[in-house]
Regions:
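Conserved beta-alpha-beta core of the PfkB/ribokinase-like small-molecule kinase fold
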Residues: 162-242, 258-260
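A glycine-rich helix N-cap at a beta->alpha junction
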Residues: 103-120
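Conserved phosphate-binding/catalytic loop of the ribokinase/pfkB sugar-kinase fold
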Residues: 112-116, 127-173
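Conserved phosphate-binding/catalytic region of the ribokinase-like
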Residues: 2-17, 22-23, 36-42, 184-185, ...
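Alpha-helix C-terminal capping segments
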Residues: 75-84, 128-130, 296-299
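Glycine-rich phosphate/adenosyl-contacting loop at the front of the ribokinase-like
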Residues: 2-88, 98-99
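Hydrophobic beta-strand scaffold residues
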Residues: 85, 111, 193-194, 251
């Protein structure tokens, strides 16, 4: 089997480069009645067009606008933990694009992808957070779908210890081609390739392609229970895990308040959750889990310790509204795991 550990003597100047949708999150708190009126399934992610995005924006109140996107959130976490990260994604040169660039750059994450001057506006995700901390997302992908192979900074892809890919990109053919090109370059450069399945509906749309992708390119897989069971067309999590063991060396399956299941060298290891306060918003839990996990791996730590780092980061972010935190994450890791990263 391929060794998924990162050699501590690796002198790469970059820990992780991520490719994903460059999105601005627009968060608002609401109750179940609004979701029912809008015919949204609580906890789901729905793709919407620009007109619908404008309509929903107008009915939201007490908005919090933050740079977002699943992989971008993970990279921001890595940077906050002292890692060196870079992001590849497309925004337009509009107001939301400025917000995205300013905030992702403020975390220390490298962002050099050229902006679009024409075409769709910057992507946004309207996130409705209910009192039970569930988030229902409506996403307008906008300029993010314009990502194509020529946008790749090949030197960065070759340099980073880990390439992290966002499953949502599979919805757009040009972005999908960029995705595959980056994975091939990373593998040919001796780097590790990680994938987030992103969303159960995304998995359903592209199940066959994802299964091939996991088998051919992926060293590290992130998914939640709904996504991994969707991948293997089953309602039985244990069955899905057994299938995954045959195809993937290292995977982390998050199971909400029950923590996560680490799959490493064919073994299952339960990673307990870290409850660091009352959960008020689960928006960034999976993203920060992946960020902490990848930071640990890039430092040469074991998969178990890396998963625990991810669990602490996830346990912290659910106590905040949104998917970014200004807290000293490294200090939290030292406090709860007694290690310095």
């Amino acid at each position: 089997m391929v060794n998924t550990m990162i050699n501590k003597t690796n002198k790469s100047s970059l820990d992780v480069v991520g490719i994903g949708n460059a999105i601005v999150d627009v968060l608002t708190t609401t109750d179940d009645s609004l979701l029912k009126r809008l015919s949204f399934d609580k906890g789901s992610m729905t793709l919407i067009d620009e007109n619908k995005a404008k309509e929903l924006y107008e009915i939201t109140t007490n908005r919090i606008q933050k740079s977002g996107g699943s992989v971008a959130n993970s990279l921001a976490c890595i940077s906050q933990l002292g890692g060196k990260a870079a992001f590849i994604g497309r925004v337009k040169n509009d107001k939301l694009g400025e917000i995205f660039i300013e905030e992702i750059s403020s975390t220390g994450t490298i962002f050099k992808t050229p902006t679009s001057s024409v075409g769709p506006s910057t992507a946004r995700c309207l996130i409705f957070v209910t009192p039970d901390a569930q988030r229902t997302m409506c996403t307008y992908l906008g300029a993010s779908v314009l990502l194509e192979p020529k946008d790749l900074d090949l030197s960065i892809v070759r340099e980073a210890k880990i390439l992290y890919l966002e499953g949502y990109l599979w919805d757009n053919p040009a972005a999908k081609n960029a995705f595959i090109k980056a994975a091939e370059i990373a593998k040919n450069s001796g780097r590790k390739v990680a994938l987030s399945l992103s969303d159960s509906f995304c998995v359903t749309r592209h199940r066959k392609s994802f299964l091939t992708l996991v088998e051919d390119y992926i060293d590290i897989l992130f998914a939640n229970e709904e996504e991994i069971t969707s991948l293997y067309k089953t309602s039985n999590l244990n069955f899905a895990i057994e299938q995954l063991k045959k195809k993937c060396e290292l995977a982390a399956i998050t199971v909400g308040k029950n923590g996560s299941i680490l799959i490493s060298n064919g073994k299952e290891i339960i990673i307990d959750p870290y409850v660091l306060g009352k959960a008020i918003d689960t928006t960034g839990a999976g993203d920060l889990y992946a960020g902490g996990f990848l930071k640990g791996l890039s430092d040469g730590l074991s998969p178990v310790m890396s998963a625990n780092i991810g669990s602490v980061c996830a346990g912290h972010i659910v106590t905040k509204l949104g998917s970014r935190s200004s807290a000293d994450l490294s200090n939290l890791i030292k406090l709860h795991l007694n290690i310095n990263i």
